[in-house]
């Protein structure tokens, strides 16, 4: 009986650890508009960061302001798609996977 309880507890701990590891990463996308692709991507990346972590967004605004960078996160699978549209002429969607450092 003790062995069964230990196995159940160990399995539960492993499952919890796995879910915590997965919770460290998130895939997000944002949409932005601007007069150029660069400005629309900037707005879209802001939306990604604001939807992920406000403190990362604040650090980003105070530092690089480079699309694809996120203070405190490793960014991968960065993709963007832009087209004519939006209030200012160009509309972009930017998406990425962000994993907490």
Descriptions of predicted regions:
Residues 16-23:
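Sec/Tat signal peptide C-region and signal peptidase I cleavage site
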Residues 27-67:
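Short, well-ordered alpha-helical segments
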Residues 8-16:
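Bacterial N-terminal signal peptides
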Residues 1-9:
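Bacterial N-terminal signal peptides that target proteins for export
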Residues 23-28, 86:
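C-terminal alpha-helical interaction appendages
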Residues 74-101:
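C-terminal edge-of-domain segments
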Residues 67-73:
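Acidic-leaning, charged glycine-interspersed low-complexity segments
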